[in-house]
């Protein structure tokens, strides 16, 4: 691929709602207004063991420039295994719900009889397939569950609700609890007559199980009643415009792009000695493996790869061997807890690994200053792009990686297989070599696109205010 074909300068397939660079203030330069509307922020994923937590932090910062965040629901609520309140109608008092949640763990077969008894006596997850039923459950049980009462009260006291859709709205069978939780929160906002905004979202059918028409029907009903829905990628926008034409939808890039200014100069480089970024507990096998004084390539995981760790270890082992032939140091980046298979690859190949729990700004720094990043992870690929690092995209669930290549204006929108075989690995190496040969010319172009996306993402607060009155 020639340098002139590496990126498209003026793609016609992105519908932009934000202002141009010259019309937009830096996100960090925004000043709070004297009286600010109160926001209930649903989907704050900062506590999630995933590098995508940076996007939630960036979104919270964007909202805080213009609004007062008076309530939050963390991403922990989306999953039963971590939710502060999930099952209702249990024999166990809500005061001891953490004990019940502990017993729910599928690995605790000794207590399976007790969970079956609870089900028989009427215990259930308050999140149902029908969002209306979910909120009926919340209202019926909030007097016994302080966590549910807190959700209701925070929503009631807010002036508007902002939901971070992230990559959680996929119409799979069975339905994802994350999807159902978000739809339930929209239902709650509508019942309370609050302006509801779904932002930062991907929306798609499930490529593995096909479309869940029941969940799609619920989403169509609820999203049409949101003030507006902002999608983070063009394919999600096209999907909503086709399947939910009554929904007021727009494209606004992911909030993580708003962190561009943090990585646009040399002060953002990782420490030359990578031991300085190791998180607690500083495991012995991590020490002495990361040297950022020399050019390096990073390889990350992916949701699809993480779902089949044995297969992933084999495929990534071959990929590492092939990429090492390019003459650069190779480091693995554990971008999510399900990327733990990379720890085994690192041990077998003697490679350094950046742990999932490393400080998030340092995680971004490692990727932003790599020579190349190969991954099936959405937000880590954005981190890389903030510094101009070219990306090679591996497949993941739904369309997110291929669509990200459109957001970043790549000419090549290809997603390679999550478990690349020998022929695909050869193509990956060939593409990598072409990107590396283009050097700083390509990196400048990528940074220019990321900078434009940062201006657009920083317009989100003004976008919300414009739609407050319908």
Regions of interest found by a model, annotated:
Residues 2-470:
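Active-site anion-handling motifs in enzyme catalytic cores
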């Amino acid at each position: 691929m020639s340098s002139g074909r590496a990126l498209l300068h003026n793609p016609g397939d992105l519908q932009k709602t934000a202002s141009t660079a010259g019309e937009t203030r830096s996100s960090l330069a925004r000043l709070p207004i004297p009286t600010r509307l109160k926001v209930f922020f649903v989907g704050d994923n900062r506590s999630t063991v995933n590098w995508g937590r940076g996007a939630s932090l960036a979104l919270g910062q964007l909202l805080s420039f213009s609004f007062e965040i008076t309530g939050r629901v963390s991403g922990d609520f989306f999953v039963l295994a971590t939710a502060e309140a999930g099952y209702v109608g249990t024999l166990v008092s809500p005061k001891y719900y953490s004990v019940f949640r502990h017993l729910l763990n599928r690995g605790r077969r000794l207590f399976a009889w007790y969970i079956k008894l609870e089900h028989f006596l009427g215990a259930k997850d308050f999140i149902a397939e029908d969002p209306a039923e979910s909120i009926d459950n919340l209202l019926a049980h909030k007097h016994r569950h302080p966590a549910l009462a807190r959700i209701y009260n925070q929503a009631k006291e807010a002036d508007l609700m902002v939901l971070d859709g992230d990559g959680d709205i996929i119409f799979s069978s069975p339905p994802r609890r994350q999807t159902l939780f978000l739809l339930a929160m929209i239902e709650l906002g509508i019942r309370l007559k609050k302006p509801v905004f779904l932002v930062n979202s991907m929306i798609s059918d499930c490529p593995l199980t096909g479309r869940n028409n029941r969940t799609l029907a619920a989403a169509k009903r609820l999203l049409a009643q949101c003030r507006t829905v902002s999608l983070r990628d063009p394919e999600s926008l096209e999907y909503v415009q086709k399947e939910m034409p009554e929904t007021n939808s727009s494209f606004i890039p992911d909030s993580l792009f708003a962190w561009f200014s943090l990585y646009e100069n040399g002060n953002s480089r990782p420490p030359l000695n990578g031991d300085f970024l190791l998180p607690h507990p500083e495991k012995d096998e991590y020490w002495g493996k990361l040297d950022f004084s020399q050019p390096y390539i990073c390889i990350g995981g992916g949701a699809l790869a993480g779902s089949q760790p044995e297969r992933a270890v084999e495929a990534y082992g071959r990929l590492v061997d092939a990429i090492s032939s390019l003459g650069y140091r190779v480091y693995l980046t554990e971008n999510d807890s399900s990327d733990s298979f990379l720890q085994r690859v690192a041990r077998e190949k003697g490679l350094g690994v950046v742990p999932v729990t490393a400080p998030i700004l340092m995680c971004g720094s490692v990727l932003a200053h790599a020579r190349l990043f190969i991954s099936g992870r959405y937000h880590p690929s954005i981190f890389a792009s903030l510094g101009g690092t070219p990306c090679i995209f591996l497949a993941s669930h739904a369309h997110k990686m291929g669509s990200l290549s459109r957001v970043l204006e790549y000419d090549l929108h290809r997603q390679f297989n999550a478990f690349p075989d020998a022929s695909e690995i050869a193509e990956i190496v060939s593409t990598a070599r072409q990107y590396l040969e283009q050097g700083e010319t390509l990196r400048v172009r990528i940074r220019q696109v990321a900078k434009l996306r940062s201006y657009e993402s920083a317009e989100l607060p003004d976008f919300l205010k414009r739609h407050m009155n319908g």
